[in-house]
Amino acid sequence: FAHCLRVRSRAEVEAFYRAALEAGARDNGAPGPRPEYEENYYACFVLDPDGYNIEAMLNEPAPQG
């Protein structure tokens, strides 16, 4: 079972990750690019105390140009 939270910035992904770990969650993937999902996907993953995976993600628009 998993939950995914869409956020507005990389800073919010990183803040979620830090807050979750401080609250007792376990690391399941530090903040970073996830090109295996999509080219501009940035996310982190934590496991809550019940073992559920929680993701904070940002799918940024492709660069223009």
Give, region by region, the residue ranges found by the protein language model.
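Glycine-rich acetyl-CoA-binding "A-motif" of GNAT/NAT acetyltransferases
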Residues: 53
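A short acidic/small-residue loop/turn micro-motif
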Residues: 35-36, 59-63
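Vicinal oxygen chelate
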Residues: 3-49
